[in-house]
Every structure is written in C-alpha cells, then in structure tokens.
C-alpha cells in the first residue's frame, strides 16, 4: 500500500537534484584537465567543492511555505549569469586555506570552472533548471540523463582519481570525453524513445502531439514516455536498447489533465492555495493530474516508481476548509513495494510485458 507523508522543507529534495557525488566529480574534472602537476590535488578538491556549491540553494526554505524550496532550487545559483559571482564566492571562501599555494586569480579560475558545470549537468536531467535567470523563468530540461546514474559518475570518478595519482591532466580529459559520449548516448536514446511514443500515439489515432521521454533512475535504456492529447495525458514505458533490436513497449494508461475549474470549483482565485497550485503547475511544467486515490491531492505525473504508471512520487494536498492565507501541504511518497521493484527490473532487463505483475498501470 502506498504511503504518503507530509514533507519537511529541509528533507524534500531527495530526487530534485543530481546527486552531490556526480556534481563533485564533474566539477573536479574540468579544472583538473588543465591543472599543473604541482597543484593537481588542490585544484581537484577546489573544483569538486565548487561543483557542489550551487545546491546550497536548498538552504532557502520556510517553515510556513512548503513550496518555497521548489521555487528557489535550481534558480539563481544555477543560472549562466550567476557563474562569475558563484565562482568568486567560492574563491573567497577557499582562499584563506590555499593562499600560500596558489594566487587568488588562479583560484578564481578553478572555482569558476567547477561552478560552471553544475547548472549544465542539472539541465541534462528532467526537472528543469533556470539557466537563463533572471531574463527567463523557463525551466530548461534536456531529458538525457537521470539524477543518479552510476554509469556516468563512476567511470569519470575513476579517471579523476587516476589523474591525481599519476599527476596528469590527461586522465580527466579522457574521462570528460567519455562522459560527453554518455550524455550524447542519452540524447540519442531519448529521441528513439520519443519516436516510439509518436508511433504509439498514432496507433491510438492521436496525431500532432508533443511527445516527451524521460529516463528512469540509473540508466538510459528505460524511458517514461508522456504525451497530451486533448484533455488527457497518456503514459507508457519504452525500453530502447543500445545494440539495436526492437524497442519494447510496456503499455500504461491515461489520466485527465488537471482542470481547476471543474475539479476544485471551491478554490477562490485570490487564495494562497490557488497561488500554490499555480506555483506547483510551473514547477511541473504543466504535467499535473488529480490523484486517482485522493480527490484533494494533485500529483506531478511526470515521475513514478514504474515508468508506465500514473502515480506521482510527490504532490500537493488542498484543503477545502482552509482559510485564504493557508498554504497547501507538500507530500512525498516514501514506500517502495517489492512488486513494483520486481516489475522495474523486468522492464530494465527487457522481458515481455506479460512478465509484469499487476500493480496497476493507471
């Protein structure tokens, strides 16, 4: 049985950001790739710390506003235009510890190089990053890699360690080339999954639809494919191999697009809950639906444990009895049942859809 919990502001970012290790590894690899031998260890450390620094925006939170962290995470600290300032802040923070080894100007170059990688890596995922803030509030998401992917992180980490041990920038250069190739593979796989999604839509008589494919956790094989036709979202899982062969489709289902007027007719326009619903809609890029099990919960249906399910991992709960100044409640799903996990493995391996146990694709 699914278990939903009210999320604390400081504990709600579990899957909203690329894991810190990946950010540290990429942040270290770039400045290490041009580091002189005598400073390669120090530069690696500074780059790693600077690469993680933008995620300090998670400290922006409120005990009374549960959506504040959604509004500010991946915002100004992740913008292209903040990179020089972010690099400077990091350089000033690290300078007292390394000033006897390196000049401040070089420290600044290193920290800026590391800091600059963060927003770009986040934009490769699916959640959206405000790379052009403050000139645009568009959430840029290239949907090429999951927030956690060991096949991306571990090889690059190995090259960085080799670079430090061998005191050679050649190793991180090789690692960065490999990492870029993996991101390129994700780009190709995304397009292949979207092409399958377009075929599925056409087979249902749905034409001229915008199909979006999102990678599942830790791989670029299995994708959640979503498109909107009229007033419904349609969801399927698609596995596209990297060595050819026919893609495998794991059919999902459909759900009505959230319609505030008909589903929440009691919600006053100027109320805080109405404003929070609009904020959550912006965060989810419009992919909102009503939870089929709870008429007061709105889910971000882009993400689910199984890619062919319409069963959000997080959502907001509205309260009809709340006052005009009361915020919504932000909730996350914490339970992962064995059946769903087994079915996910079936999809990853590429077995037939008939091997999937019935947990209910909505």
PLM segments and residue spans:
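Polar-ligand-bearing catalytic/cofactor-coordination segments
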Residues: 194-210, 220-221, 231-244
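Residue-level detector of flexible, active-site-proximal loop/helix-junction positions
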Residues: 138, 218, 305
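Fold-independent oxyanion-binding glycine-rich loops
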Residues: 214-217, 300-302
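A generic structural signal for short, solvent-exposed coil/turn residues
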Residues: 50, 123, 203-205, 217-219, ...
């Amino acid at each position: 049985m699914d278990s939903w919990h009210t999320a604390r502001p400081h504990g709600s970012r579990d899957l909203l950001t690329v894991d810190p290790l990946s950010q540290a590894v990429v942040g270290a690899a770039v400045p290490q790739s041009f580091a002189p031998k005598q400073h390669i260890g120090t530069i690696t450390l500074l780059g790693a710390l600077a690469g993680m620094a933008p995620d300090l925006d998670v400290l922006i939170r409120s005990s009374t506003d549960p959506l504040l962290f959604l509004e500010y995470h991946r915002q100004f600290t992740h913008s292209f235009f903040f990179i020089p300032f972010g690099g400077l802040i990091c350089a000033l923070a690290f300078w007292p510890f390394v000033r006897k080894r390196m000049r401040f100007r070089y420290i600044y170059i290193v920290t800026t190089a590391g800091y600059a990688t963060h927003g770009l890596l986040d934009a490769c995922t699916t959640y959206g990053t405000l790379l052009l803030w403050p000139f645009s509030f568009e959430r840029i998401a290239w949907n090429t890699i999951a927030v956690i992917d060991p096949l991306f992180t571990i090889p690059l980490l190995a090259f960085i360690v080799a670079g430090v041990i061998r005191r050679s920038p050649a190793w991180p250069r090789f690692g960065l080339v490999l990492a870029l190739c993996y991101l390129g593979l994700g780009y190709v796989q995304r397009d292949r999954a979207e092409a399958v999604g377009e075929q599925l839509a056409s087979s249902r008589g749905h034409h001229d639809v915008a199909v979006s494919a999102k990678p599942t956790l830790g791989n670029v094989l299995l994708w959640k494919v979503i498109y909107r036709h009229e007033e419904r979202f349609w969801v399927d899982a698609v596995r596209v191999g990297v060595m050819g062969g026919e893609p495998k489709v794991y059919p999902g289902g459909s759900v009505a697009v959230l319609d505030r007027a008909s589903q929440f007719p009691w919600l006053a326009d100027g109320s805080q809950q109405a404003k929070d619903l609009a904020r959550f809609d912006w965060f989810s890029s419009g992919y909102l639906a009503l939870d089929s099990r709870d008429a007061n919960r709105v889910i971000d249906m882009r993400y689910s444990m199984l890619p062919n399910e319409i069963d959000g991992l997080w959502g907001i709960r509205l309260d009809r009895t709340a006052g005009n100044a009361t915020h919504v409640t932000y909730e996350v799903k914490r339970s992962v049942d064995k059946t769903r996990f087994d079915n996910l493995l079936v999809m990853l391996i590429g077995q037939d859809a008939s091997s999937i146990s019935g947990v209910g694709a909505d």
